């Protein structure tokens, strides 16, 4: 299988504390990897390294066999869903959802149609489309963020505790939708979670990270 993410001999320190040392990881096309571990073990740091937001002190991180730094083309192939409300405060819900499609030059009407269809699947009423992030509940904002992260059909999707702000009903609906997207596409998923039951439901592979001593 084609390797989508390759991490080789990576070391990374944060505030003089070793988070990773000689860390290796290979993620293949179509994998759904759930990363488990206690708070502070380095789960979100791993996503930061893969996204190119953090640079290892040693070793290499490659996405699609290339380094991500300043590679706009590669970035279009990645979707990222952050923990909590990470929406652009100056854009309304619909504008947030269509942001990545706009960057790709997709027709505005087509982009909005796609966003509204996904919003309906996620239980977001059309009356919310004109609301700004500070007017949305935590669960509504999280669902808008999930749509923004998947709407452009990225080949690699990274999720950091994506269901944390949701009630049990919406959590199950969105888990089912994410599972459906994974099953019906060739996309590769990497999801950080502390919930082992959630990992068992979604993952094809799991990785437990422990804090270095």
From Swiss-Prot:
- Membrane topology note: Peripheral membrane protein
Query: Where's it mainly located?
Result: membrane
Q: Which UniProt keywords apply?
A: Amino-acid transport, ATP-binding, Cell inner membrane, Cell membrane, Membrane, Nucleotide-binding, Translocase, Transport
- Gene Ontology annotations of biological process type: amino acid transport
Any Pfam family from its record, for instance, is: ABC_tran
Give the miscellaneous note. The gastric pathogen H.pylori is unable to synthesize ergothioneine. During infection, the EgtUV ABC transporter gives H.pylori a competitive colonization avantage in the host gastric environment by allowing the uptake of this human dietary antioxidant, which is present at high levels in gastrointestinal tissues.
Put simply, this protein is called Ergothioneine transport ATP-binding protein EgtV
Native source organism of the sequence:
Helicobacter pylori (strain G27)
Tell me the gene name.
egtV
């Amino acid at each position: 299988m084609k390797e989508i993410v390759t991490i080789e001999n990576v070391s990374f320190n944060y505030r003089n504390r070793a988070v990773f040392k000689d860390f290796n990881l290979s993620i293949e096309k179509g994998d759904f990897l759930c990363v488990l571990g206690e708070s502070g073990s380095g789960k979100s740091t791993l996503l930061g390294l893969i996204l190119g937001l953090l640079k290892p002190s040693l070793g290499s991180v490659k996405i699609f066999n290339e380094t991500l730094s300043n590679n706009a083309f590669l970035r279009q192939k990645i979707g990222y869903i952050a923990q909590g409300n990470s929406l652009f405060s100056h854009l309304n819900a619909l504008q947030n959802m269509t942001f990545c499609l706009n960057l790709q030059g997709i027709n505005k009407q087509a982009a909005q149609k796609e966003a509204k269809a996904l919003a309906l699947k996620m239980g977001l009423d059309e009356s919310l489309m004109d609301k700004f992030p500070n007017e949305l509940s935590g669960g509504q904002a999280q669902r808008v963020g999930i749509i923004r992260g998947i709407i452009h059909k990225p080949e690699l999707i990274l999720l950091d505790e994506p269901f944390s702000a949701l009630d049990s009903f919406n959590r199950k609906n969105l888990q089912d939708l994410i599972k459906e997207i994974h099953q019906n596409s060739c996309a590769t998923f990497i999801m950080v979670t502390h919930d082992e039951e959630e990992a068992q439901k979604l993952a094809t592979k799991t990785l437990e990270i422990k804090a270095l001593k």
